[in-house]
From Swiss-Prot:
Protein name according to UniProt: Zinc finger A20 and AN1 domain-containing stress-associated protein 7
Entry keyword Magnesium: no
Keyword Metal-binding (UniProt): yes
Natural source organism: Arabidopsis thaliana (Mouse-ear cress)
Gene Ontology molecular function: DNA binding; zinc ion binding
C-alpha cells in the first residue's frame, strides 16, 4: 500500500533519450542531450579551437613600438577578413627525436631515470639527481664517485663573480 501512495505522488518517470550524435548511448539534458563521451569530445574540440584562435590572434598582433615614416605602408598589414582559423595537430615525424639528441651529446648513453648511471642498480624514488643530469644510487651520488662531468668550480667562480663585482676606486690625487 505504501508503494501505491508513493507512486501516485511522485513524478512520472521520463523515458531516456538517445544521444543526439547517434552513437547509441543515452544522452543527458545537462550535456545538451549528448552522452558523456560525445559531450567530452565536443568540449575538447571547443577548447582546442579557442586555443587556436587565441594563438592566431596573439601571433598577428603588430609591435606597438615600430616607427613608420608618414606615407609608408606597414609591411605586415593584414586584413582580418582574409584570415582563416587553422587547427594544427601534432603528427609523429619520421625522424626519431632520440637520434637528434644523441648527436648533440654522444658521451652519455640514454638510460632510464630509475637506475643508477654508474652501477645500473634500481634506485626508484630514492635516486639522487646530479647536476650532470644523471640519477645515481646512494654510493655513487657524490661527484668524485661517478666521475661527474659538471664543473662545480666554474659554477662557483661565476656565482662569486656575479655576487661580488669588481670595485675600482678612483685614483688618489697627490698634493
Amino acid at each position: 500500500m505504501g508503494s501505491e501512495e508513493n507512486n501516485s505522488t511522485s513524478f512520472p518517470p521520463t523515458e531516456p533519450k538517445l544521444c543526439d550524435n547517434g552513437c547509441g548511448f543515452f544522452g543527458s539534458p545537462s550535456n545538451m542531450n549528448l552522452c558523456s563521451k560525445c559531450y567530452r569530445s565536443l568540449r575538447a574540440e571547443e577548447d582546442q579551437t579557442a586555443v587556436a584562435k587565441a594563438a592566431v590572434k596573439n601571433s598577428l598582433k603588430l609591435p606597438s613600438c615600430s616607427i613608420i615614416a608618414p606615407g609608408q605602408k606597414h609591411p605586415l598589414e593584414i586584413k582580418p577578413a582574409h584570415l582563416e582559423t587553422v587547427v594544427v595537430t601534432a603528427e609523429p615525424s619520421s625522424v626519431p627525436v632520440a637520434a637528434e639528441q644523441d648527436e648533440a651529446e654522444p658521451s652519455r648513453p640514454v638510460r632510464p631515470n630509475n637506475r643508477c648511471f654508474s652501477c645500473n642498480k634500481k634506485v626508484g624514488v630514492m635516486g639522487f639527481k646530479c647536476k650532470c643530469g644523471s640519477t645515481f644510487c646512494g654510493s655513487h651520488r657524490y661527484p668524485e664517485k661517478h666521475e661527474c662531468s659538471f664543473d662545480f668550480k666554474e659554477v662557483g667562480r661565476d656565482a662569486i663573480a656575479k655576487a661580488n663585482p669588481l670595485v675600482k676606486a678612483d685614483k688618489v690625487q697627490r698634493i
